[in-house]
Amino acid sequence: MQRREFITLVGGAAAAWPLAADAQKPVMPVIGVLESGSATSTTSLSAEFHAGLKESGFVEGQNVTIEYRRAEAQYDRLPAFAAELVGRQVAVIVASGATVSPFAAQAATKIIPIVFLMGTDPVQTGLVASLSRPGGNITGVTTFGSEILSKQLEMLHELVPKARAIAMLVNPKNPTHLVGKAPWQTFADAIDRKSVV
């Protein structure tokens, strides 16, 4: 799924929100953004997000409000932030960054649509049933794929063919930090190299 499709998902969810609105909800739809990182770590993503919303006819402050909750890499804050967004009755939750963001959003609501952007496999982590039919109130985009990881490892091997070991750096605080370990190990074994995670 490309950026345009991602923005269309978010825009479509925000556009559909007024149809289900009741007297208790704000007049202008609110998009809740739940991020595992900081504002500086997501600057380029935020610019693309706003540009895509504008292409879909949504301008922050004019016809949509965006509320950000950023965990600053303190993942234990995400469940409370997700609950805040649910309490705010947002139209859609955009969960990005570490896999814990969409999981926190998913645990907080089974009704509000959730659109995720993450770098791990959402099927392997148990977030969705499948990429084509995610199920429930969640859908999104992933930048992870075993094909991508295999290509990255292949390029690494071409750049440093004499390397005897290859290492993968992970964030041990991210509960899905070992998702890429199996394909990484498989590739390392195939080229007869030691793998360090």
Briefly describe each language-model feature range:
Residues 1-197:
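Short hydrophobic alpha-helices and adjacent helix-cap/hinge residues
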